């Protein structure tokens, strides 16, 4: 039925999409357009699904985590591949803190006893699942060592709102070990919030309702997580800073000055360990106390209770805290007329175990792009701008390789980097794009020119159809009526973070997915067998990713005038500001209503006497906030962006080569204008005023983060100050864009 409706909308013309011929090639003079179109047509025929399949088979053949023999072996193989494609390539090394487990114990000691297996089961159908001697055991990297015993408390997803719920039930986690479900936030938030509330240890498990049998057959019969499957992952406090915990802000070179482990701000305060739902079930079943709220209950065949106790758990974690060597593979095609401007493209090569989906499915697409670009280069094509392709090491533990490289080359990147294009895992489904909104119009143009391999419509048209069919009323109307499909904002979670969040380099994150859900994330089952049975089995979406990212790289590298557009940026910021105003009003209303309920004794009167709820603390009323500076700055940017768009269109259509170089040099700095050298409160590594990972969400983005988090946390004095700081960044952007418009119209 769903497929039928999609076909109907497309065939009857209700889903309107531009054809490639209808979309101007943004950034190219009329005399350059046909050559670029011809080049892209040649490029798009080159990425080969068969090559991707064999590259994945080779790269995912053995576990290749940081510090492993196969991690280095893969880096050297990648080096040789780039060389064979005609690229200038080298390996850049960094020495980083990467703890690996020595001891792991989880056991129920009361009221009954049970010892968790902490072992994923090898499966006869899956030929690489039995490489136990090379596999990293299931653990959470950067958990502090510890040996603790205490009562167990179930905390749902372990986010701040869950602790508010527990407090109303009169349940404290002080001196307890908490058990939290994966999901609801990035995993590193769970031990962070638990420690803030006095917990002494943290267990994290994947509930079958989220990615197990409640969603389909489990592996190997189906794609979902089996009972002993465990999600490994880092719990370093990356919202403070990513990368090597011992060298914040500087590259982790051999001679770098390092903090001690005790000084590192991103290492957890309590021991943490991930477990399977098979190991979690006896622990949860032993809990007493109130029945968990309906929204907290998972898919296990037990009564979910909160605790604390009578279950008591013993948790022991001990790791090897030595430095390990990273192997970043850096390849370069030199530019010609604007060689000092760089287009950077990256995907990581390390994995928690075999990592076929994460990250090799994205890496093999990047390799095919590099092979195709190298072939064009050998045939005589030369890019205007220098193209850099990177295969990062150490992404999984904490964006290590990309962060250390970006910090080491920070001054060069600030001077030369036009844009960074990232990918990670890739699968079947719809095109996903997030990134700098000055590149939103540009990426819409790219998406129109790439065909979805299964539906045979453009990637743009298929994404539009999905939003019309599945979106809210607002999303549906906008997908039909807005000229460009919206792209998302970037928080953290992959290798773009250092570029956009720390250096202010315009960035994009690209990938396909949404139609190949699974439950093998960060487990031993993320391997070639799983991917070739349950994901992009024919690798045609790998080809689509290579075409999408490769065309974007070609256009950025070859454009006569860089294809940034600022009207979309201004309009997006306007939606952020409106949302902030609504957030302030909602918070004020919530506080007023909550305080009234406390004063009127509502909590006590409505509470079940047999399961009483404790009234929360009264909060200070929310003051009005002065958004005027931000609104005024936004008006300035909107006006400047409109002027720029008109001047840009005219200058490009007239082929005004005389102004191109000067404009391009200033466009490189456009994203930098949105940063502040002071950085965000309590985390100065993050300098972008529009985008950052949430302090209590992790990967998830907070837009205009200084203001948003001040409102969310009730820090009202900070809110007005952060509004002024955000306004100053938008004013800087407006001034830069206005100056560019003047130059394009013939001014100085």
PLM feature segments, named:
Residues 22-38, 57-172, 177, 208, ...:
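Noncatalytic luminal/extracellular "stalk/propeptide" segments of secretory-pathway proteins
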Residues 38-46, 60-69, 138-143, 177-184, ...:
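Second-shell loop/turn segments in exported
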Residues 113, 143, 226-291, 338, ...:
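Metal-dependent peptidase/peptidase-like ectodomains
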Residues 130-165, 240-357, 371, 375-379:
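Soluble metallo-hydrolase cores and metallopeptidase-like ectodomains found primarily
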Residues 152-224, 336-340, 352, 367, ...:
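A conserved hydrophobic secondary-structure block that centers on an alpha-helix together
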Residues 208, 329, 345-399, 404, ...:
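Alpha-helical metal-binding/catalytic segments enriched in His/Glu/Asp
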Residues 388, 449, 501, 516-575, ...:
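His/Asp/Glu-rich mid-to-C-terminal helical/loop segments that flank catalytic regions of hydrolases
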Residues 653-748:
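C-terminal amphipathic alpha-helical interaction region
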